[in-house]
A protein has these predicted regions:
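Sec-dependent N-terminal signal peptides
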Residues: 3-13
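Subset of outer-membrane beta-barrel
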Residues: 16-172
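Positively charged n-region of N-terminal signal peptides that target proteins for export
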Residues: 1-4, 96
Length: 172
């Protein structure tokens, strides 16, 4: 009983971050759609997931990815119909050269994310994701990340991200 409350609190905290991974340097699974679209280029087979949040808006999120393509949709009480989700993303990713991945994602709210991921070895990943308006007139922000696996397997990954929030109009 002594450990029950800390375990419930810990599991509750983990469940608040539905698909998001540790870092933009580790977008291996469904989190590739939300964090770094370059992760869609990593072959993980077909994956799908649904998350029901018991919040005041009755949020329902579902994601799918396969063969470099992925999407996620979020519905809640403010959504009006099947073809009008509250939020939606669709993206593609691929590997132009060995151990380097790139991807692009479009968001329903008129944003484009460009993502890059480099894994020279299985124990280190370097990634970045950059958000723009879908006409590329407005730069929103960039996130740069690095992650290492000190035990040389997937059981422990340590990652850190740097967010560059310097928004502004792009000049050419």
């Amino acid at each position: 009983m002594r450990l029950f409350i800390p375990m419930v609190v810990f599991s509750f905290l983990l469940s608040q971050n539905i698909w998001n991974g540790v870092s933009v340097a580790t977008p291996d699974n469904l989190d590739a759609i939300s964090s770094n679209p370059a992760g869609l280029g990593i072959d993980r087979g077909e994956q799908s997931g649904t998350y029901l949040s018991f919040d005041s808006k009755y949020t329902n999120s579902s994601s799918f990815r396969s063969n470099g393509f992925g999407y996620d949709l979020t519905y809640n009480i403010h959504s009006h119909g099947l073809f009008n989700p509250e939020d939606g993303n669709i993206g593609v990713g691929f590997s132009p050269v060995r151990n380097f991945y790139t991807g692009i994602k479009w968001n329903k709210h008129s944003f484009i994310d460009l993502g890059f991921l480099y894994r020279p070895f299985n124990f280190i990943s370097i990634g970045s994701a950059h958000k723009f308006s879908d006409d590329f007139e407005q730069y929103e922000y960039s996130t740069y990340g690095v992650a290492i696996r000190p035990l040389f397997n997937h059981r422990l990954t340590i990652g850190a991200d740097y967010n560059d929030m310097d928004s502004g109009v792009l000049t050419y």
